[in-house]
């Protein structure tokens, strides 16, 4: 029966799949071991205290030995009670261990004659004819080289501080291994530690027999040991003897450890503190930081206007606010030459009635009646805003007429001619005008700077011709519009106008000579309601010198005052007006509509359309200042 089982085992082990090559693979060994366990199920059990294999080892890949333990059964401890058998591919039967003595007690040694590399082996332990343990392996898988020998070390160098040193550790491969011939390739692993430490430090495996060790302390002692293994395997052999490394005694002061500033700790604590500070800053100022990083989208609004007015649809109040502020004024109002502004003084309520235009309008005083037509010159010497159709070429002629005219500063002038006197004398051609030249003196009335100034109604020559025609016709006097009188401005921006009144005056009758009047009226050319230097010379040449001591010669002391032709013609007819008391009523102008409230002290009025004849473009000339007029006057 045993022979039959042995033959079956050999048949399985010698199959073509298992032994197809010259060497056995681990898979084959596993399959062989499984086959043996199937054939001999008694080998699987070893829990009764029977002997068992502990290890099988080959130190140089030429020989190997197997060891087992003693069993707990004392009957098996007698010599010859435990036997080991082995089988391999080239033999067809189990053979007993060739040497029970060389490897020691409870061991079996296989010398080179019984060792075959890359050949699987199966071994078993028997006691009294029964199998107690078994094992299958290949020789190359059980290689565990002997430890290296001849360890020593050499000092390489010492640091300048005499604190650290570098050494080189050397050893020799196991003497029983044929490393030089390349029969076996070994890898070495070095372990070291300080003398009083328990934990060994390990270096990376290397295939050389020497390794340097750096930065060893001169005041310390070190222990070094080395072990080896076959390349591409995981089982190391035993460690070599421990090598003690002791450096020669150095100067104690040189061996003192140099002080090292704890930069690492300071950097770590600094980073930690900075992170905490930044976190607290962000946590406390998160709203502000959010506003800086992500600013809110501004709500659409207009400066100075409550958004609720737009939501409630109060467009009238919005338009009023836009009209008051200059910033929101349309360009149309800036470019419109037919719009004039009235400046108001509402600082002192007592000054509103003192010397106002209403008093001058209602007064019968001759001097106040002439102030009605005073005007503020906002053009500062430019062409009047009431002549938008004058060609640009006229301005060049005006600049070349009088090079010494002062046109750089804004001027303020009040004066009005008695147009009705001259008009009536031209119609009647009365011979009683011989005494008129004595009274034809230019008159200039200065206006206080802090008082409200009425708007000057004047413009082109055609406009004055229309006014002359209306004044000569009593039935059309009631339709003349001059300006509107503003009495107060409410806090809401509303304007209160004074009621219309009329001054009673007689029909003007002048005693001036018709020849003088005719020549004066014919020679004056009105250009922008200012007095030209050429016209002034003509007027002075034509006006006869009258010795009237009661008349006061006009003096022009205020600088930058311009003379209008109407002011000069008014002086010519003033004496006749004083002698004759008119019986007709000169109408106070009707109220004109207010276009918009520009500012707390300014109004924008609608232009009054007067009947204009066909436009006639007249050449303009330079303006005459008061100083120049005084020089050319006789």
UniProtKB/Swiss-Prot annotation:
<keyword id="KW-0675">Receptor</keyword>
<feature type="glycosylation site" description="N-linked (GlcNAc...) asparagine">
    <location>
        <position position="111"/>
    </location>
</feature>
<dbReference type="InterPro" id="IPR015152">
    <property type="entry name" value="Growth/epo_recpt_lig-bind"/>
</dbReference>
<keyword id="KW-1133">Transmembrane helix</keyword>
<feature type="glycosylation site" description="N-linked (GlcNAc...) asparagine">
    <location>
        <position position="152"/>
    </location>
</feature>
<feature type="region of interest" description="Required for JAK2 binding">
    <location>
        <begin position="290"/>
        <end position="375"/>
    </location>
</feature>
<feature type="disulfide bond">
    <location>
        <begin position="122"/>
        <end position="136"/>
    </location>
</feature>
<feature type="disulfide bond">
    <location>
        <begin position="97"/>
        <end position="108"/>
    </location>
</feature>
<feature type="glycosylation site" description="N-linked (GlcNAc...) asparagine">
    <location>
        <position position="73"/>
    </location>
</feature>
<keyword id="KW-1003">Cell membrane</keyword>
<comment type="similarity">
    <text>Belongs to the type I cytokine receptor family. Type 1 subfamily.</text>
</comment>
<feature type="modified residue" description="Phosphotyrosine">
    <location>
        <position position="483"/>
    </location>
</feature>
<feature type="short sequence motif" description="UbE motif">
    <location>
        <begin position="336"/>
        <end position="345"/>
    </location>
</feature>
<dbReference type="InterPro" id="IPR013783">
    <property type="entry name" value="Ig-like_fold"/>
</dbReference>
<dbReference type="GO" id="GO:0009897">
    <property type="term" value="C:external side of plasma membrane"/>
</dbReference>
<feature type="short sequence motif" description="Box 1 motif">
    <location>
        <begin position="293"/>
        <end position="301"/>
    </location>
</feature>
<keyword id="KW-0325">Glycoprotein</keyword>
<dbReference type="GO" id="GO:0005576">
    <property type="term" value="C:extracellular region"/>
</dbReference>
<protein>
    <recommendedName>
        <fullName>Growth hormone receptor</fullName>
    </recommendedName>
</protein>
<keyword id="KW-0812">Transmembrane</keyword>
<dbReference type="InterPro" id="IPR036116">
    <property type="entry name" value="FN3_sf"/>
</dbReference>
<feature type="glycosylation site" description="N-linked (GlcNAc...) asparagine">
    <location>
        <position position="46"/>
    </location>
</feature>
<feature type="modified residue" description="Phosphotyrosine">
    <location>
        <position position="591"/>
    </location>
</feature>
<keyword id="KW-0832">Ubl conjugation</keyword>
<dbReference type="InterPro" id="IPR003528">
    <property type="entry name" value="Long_hematopoietin_rcpt_CS"/>
</dbReference>
<dbReference type="InterPro" id="IPR003961">
    <property type="entry name" value="FN3_dom"/>
</dbReference>
<keyword id="KW-1015">Disulfide bond</keyword>
<comment type="subunit">
    <text>On growth hormone (GH) binding, forms homodimers and binds JAK2 via a box 1-containing domain.</text>
</comment>
<dbReference type="GO" id="GO:0006897">
    <property type="term" value="P:endocytosis"/>
</dbReference>
<feature type="transmembrane region" description="Helical">
    <location>
        <begin position="261"/>
        <end position="284"/>
    </location>
</feature>
<feature type="domain" description="Fibronectin type-III">
    <location>
        <begin position="147"/>
        <end position="250"/>
    </location>
</feature>
<feature type="topological domain" description="Cytoplasmic">
    <location>
        <begin position="285"/>
        <end position="634"/>
    </location>
</feature>
<dbReference type="Pfam" id="PF12772">
    <property type="entry name" value="GHBP"/>
</dbReference>
<feature type="glycosylation site" description="N-linked (GlcNAc...) asparagine">
    <location>
        <position position="157"/>
    </location>
</feature>
<feature type="topological domain" description="Extracellular">
    <location>
        <begin position="19"/>
        <end position="260"/>
    </location>
</feature>
<feature type="disulfide bond">
    <location>
        <begin position="56"/>
        <end position="66"/>
    </location>
</feature>
<dbReference type="Pfam" id="PF09067">
    <property type="entry name" value="EpoR_lig-bind"/>
</dbReference>
<keyword id="KW-0964">Secreted</keyword>
<feature type="short sequence motif" description="WSXWS motif">
    <location>
        <begin position="236"/>
        <end position="240"/>
    </location>
</feature>
<dbReference type="InterPro" id="IPR025871">
    <property type="entry name" value="GHBP"/>
</dbReference>
<feature type="signal peptide">
    <location>
        <begin position="1"/>
        <end position="18"/>
    </location>
</feature>
<keyword id="KW-0597">Phosphoprotein</keyword>
